[in-house]
Amino acid sequence: TLYVTLEPCCHRGRTPPCVEAIIRSGIRRVVAAGRDPNPLVHGKGFALLRKHGIEVDVGLLRTEAAAINEDFFWSVRHGRTWVSLKLAMTLDGKIADSQGKSKWISGTRSRVFVHNLRRRHAAIAVGRGTLLADDPRLTVRHVEGVSPARFVFSSTDSIPPSSRFVRTARQVRSVIVVGGGRARTRTRRKDGVEVWATGEKSRAKRLGVAMEMAFEEGIPSMFVEGG
């Protein structure tokens, strides 16, 4: 018996359909918490399993599974990426000193917690200021897991070639989101960095378009680290 929190997919995208692997495996029963809200799947995965003689039970721990998959469900309903924001700040609301220099105010336990949050998201994002000031790796460490795609929101695609973001762009998907350029276009530079142009000058509109573009790329959730 296979237990899953979501209906196995039946469409072909970046990876083969899950139902094909289940059918080939010889599994005779699938217990799922609920249906996949994606119109490409919604009920079709279960139907295909039943067609091949596999018993399907739906509804076990439905509420708990909905909480686990909250970001995915939201992104499918709204057609844009779910955003989580992380801030390490003092009680008086500061994330840096008066000179703009950040200080360590978190401990080992909180850093491990943050890296757990990173691995649960499909992407991680910072602004250009944070990238230039801290030269962050934006990867999953301290815990086991695959590093998510990395995003930098910037007014320009000019990022120092010496930055960790650029140097490791061929190892982890790396995207710079800019406001100018032709609306909703994506290009890939020789260094491996992708540049997404939203065509929006307004910062608020730029972020909205970027989240729609990210969803189109199969990114249901993004973890934003400010400061």
Question: Which ranges hold each PLM region?
Answer:
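Residues that form or flank phosphate/diphosphate-binding pockets in enzymes
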Residues: 12-13, 40-41, 67, 133-134, ...
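Zn2+-dependent cytidine deaminase-like catalytic core
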Residues: 1-64, 180, 201
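Short, structured interface segments
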Residues: 61-76
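General beta-strand structural signal in soluble alpha/beta enzymes
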Residues: 4, 32, 56-59, 97, ...
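Conserved S/T- and glycine-rich ATP-binding loop of Class I adenylate-forming
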Residues: 9, 93, 224
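Active-site ligand-binding patch in enzyme domains
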Residues: 74-78, 82-220
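Short acidic/polar active-site loop segments enriched in Thr and Asp
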Residues: 28, 220, 225
